[in-house]
Amino acid sequence: MDIQLINIGFGNIVSANRVIAIVSPESAPIKRIISDARERGQLIDATYGRRTRAVIITDSSHVVLSAIQPETVAHRFVVNKEVQANSN
């Protein structure tokens, strides 16, 4: 199993293999997930003080905040997967 890394903005990188969901932070349930993760100490803020535009949820229950759009992060996953497929 190869480790696939995805840039989530400002030089921050997450493991593509660990990501469960990439969602928008606008809804109340997602805001609750962010709040709960902050209380548990499992919130990673990678926004550099900018507005949160994407919330990345991992299989270890960590929640990562990113300042780039969810569509952009998803596109990077697709491109990364295509590159991996072509290299094999």
UniProtKB/Swiss-Prot annotation:
A Pfam family annotated for this UniProt entry: RemA-like
InterPro entries reported in the protein's UniProt record: RemA-like
Coiled-coil region: none
Similarity annotation: Belongs to the RemA family.
NCBIfam families according to UniProt: MtxBflmRegRemA (NF046064), PRK04323.1 (NF003315)
Protein name listed in UniProt: Putative regulatory protein PCC7424_3427
Source organism per UniProt: Gloeothece citriformis (strain PCC 7424) (Cyanothece sp. (strain PCC 7424))
